Amino acid sequence: MSQKLKTTYQETIVPKLKEQFGYTNIHQVPKVIKITVNRGLGEASQNAKALESSKAELSTITGQQPVVTRAKKAIAGFKIREGMPVGVMVTLRGDRMYAFLDRLINLALPRIRDFRGISGNSFDGRGNYSLGIREQLIFPEIEYDKIDQIRGMDISIITTAKNDEEGRALLKEMGMPFR
């Protein structure tokens, strides 16, 4: 697996952020803890094939088996009962997380049509970043002929940053293409 981003973080990003924010200890420097990739499927309760294809796509993209998320409450308007499958999600940590982030930044995001950079407004106030993707075709692992329907996904990058400024600086140094 590609360790390029991890070594870049340890060798160049940590000293740069330590100097920029005036940290005394390297453990104060913000780092990425985990990345969650989530896909909500409204039709999963009626269509089991959509759930299986989504599981296969997410495991191809992330390299890890996704878990099926189930409805916590029954919602009559959406024809959902408690315990019905409503989506799939993957939590990435460690080496897989760095490999996925590297592929996302360098391969997937530049393949988005009319891409001019991602919004810098999607931070949550605690240094975590959320990103919505409209189609799975931007990942080179997905073959156009094999997909049954274009579906998006939500990607959340959870960091140890104390505020949005630190989180933005960390992701910018990692190469995240902000506008």
Curated annotation (Swiss-Prot):
Q: State if rRNA-binding is listed as a keyword.
A: yes
Pfam families per the UniProt record, alphabetical: Ribosomal_L5, Ribosomal_L5_C
Q: Name one GO cellular component term.
A: ribosome
Query: Which GO molecular function terms does the record list?
Result: rRNA binding; structural constituent of ribosome; tRNA binding
Indicate yes or no for the key word Flavoprotein.
no
The record's Gene Ontology biological-process terms are:
translation
PROSITE patterns noted in UniProt? RIBOSOMAL_L5 (PS00358)
The record, for InterPro entries, names: Ribosomal_uL5, Ribosomal_uL5_bac-type, Ribosomal_uL5_C, Ribosomal_uL5_CS, Ribosomal_uL5_dom_sf, Ribosomal_uL5_N
Q: List the disulfide bonds.
A: none
Record keywords, A-Z: Ribonucleoprotein, Ribosomal protein, RNA-binding, rRNA-binding, tRNA-binding
**Subunit structure, per the record?**
Part of the 50S ribosomal subunit; part of the 5S rRNA/L5/L18/L25 subcomplex. Contacts the 5S rRNA and the P site tRNA. Forms a bridge to the 30S subunit in the 70S ribosome.
What function does this protein fulfil?
This is one of the proteins that bind and probably mediate the attachment of the 5S RNA into the large ribosomal subunit, where it forms part of the central protuberance. In the 70S ribosome it contacts protein S13 of the 30S subunit (bridge B1b), connecting the 2 subunits; this bridge is implicated in subunit movement. Contacts the P site tRNA; the 5S rRNA and some of its associated proteins might help stabilize positioning of ribosome-bound tRNAs.
Q: Which family does it belong to?
A: Belongs to the universal ribosomal protein uL5 family.
Q: What is the protein's given name?
A: Large ribosomal subunit protein uL5
Q: Which organism is it from?
A: Microcystis aeruginosa (strain NIES-843 / IAM M-2473)
User: Which gene is annotated as encoding this protein in its UniProt record?
Assistant: rplE
